[in-house]
Each structure stands twice: as structure tokens, then as C-alpha cells.
Amino acid sequence: RRSSDLEAIRNLAEKPCIILGRCASDILKDRMNVLNIFVCADKEDRIKRIMKLEDLSYEDAKEKIDKTDEQRASYYYEHTGKTWGDVNDYHMILDTSALGVENCPDILMHYFEKLEYI
């Protein structure tokens, strides 16, 4: 990981922001004002969602998800030495299969309002 990436993430985190991926949960692990959230779903739900969004066959969608998951896990491990998706690295996990994709933004907004972040 380049030092410019680390610096960019740390600079962004000086103000309220949302950072997707890039090992930000590990880069910012020592900060008190950070909330690390992992969004996940059952594999079958993910396959169906990708099939619909990208007009793919079941096998092509499954292959795409498998490849993407492998790349994410590899990238995360390479840069942190940790397992991608390990529940111990996150403050909150949102399972869109259980909660519904459409409900997750509302859940987060309610949580942030409760903590008076917004």
C-alpha cells in the first residue's frame, strides 16, 4: 500500500466521511471517532442481485462474486495481515439478507441520530 493512500485516508478521516474499503478499518483502527461497518449478505442473495443488476446468468454471477471476494480477501490480507470480514475488526455488521438492502440506510441514519453524529 502506498503511503499516499494511507495519507489520503487519514486526511479524509479528519472530517466526517464515509470510506468504502481500502483497508480503512485497519488504517483508522486507533482513532476514537471511527465506526467500522461491514455490509454482507448470503451468497445466494448476492448472486441473485448481481444477476439482476448486470443481466448475468447464475454461473457468471457466481463466478464474479467468487472472484471479487477472493480479490478483496487477498487485498485485505496483503495490507493488514488479517482476514477480510472478521467480525472482530468491525463495530457493526449489517446483513442485507436479514435486514433488507433498502432498510440498511435507515438503520444507519437512526443509529447516527441516536449518537448525535447528525
Residue ranges and their predicted role:
Residues 57-102:
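Small-molecule kinase domains that catalyze NTP-dependent phosphoryl transfer to phosphate-bearing small molecules
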Residues 6, 101-109:
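Short, amphipathic alpha-helical "lid/cap" segments that border enzyme active or binding sites
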Residues 26-28, 35, 39, 85, ...:
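Surface-exposed, interaction-prone regions with an acidic/low-complexity signature
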Residues 10-54:
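ATP-dependent NMP and nucleoside kinases share a basic, alpha-helical "lid"
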Residues 53-55, 109-111:
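Short, solvent-exposed amphipathic alpha-helical segments in soluble enzyme
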Residues 2-3:
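Short, small-residue-biased leader/transition segments that mark boundaries at the very start
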Residues 54-57, 117:
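Arginine/glycine-rich "motif VI" loop of SF2 helicases in the C-terminal RecA-like domain
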Residues 110-118:
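Short, charged, intrinsically disordered terminal tails
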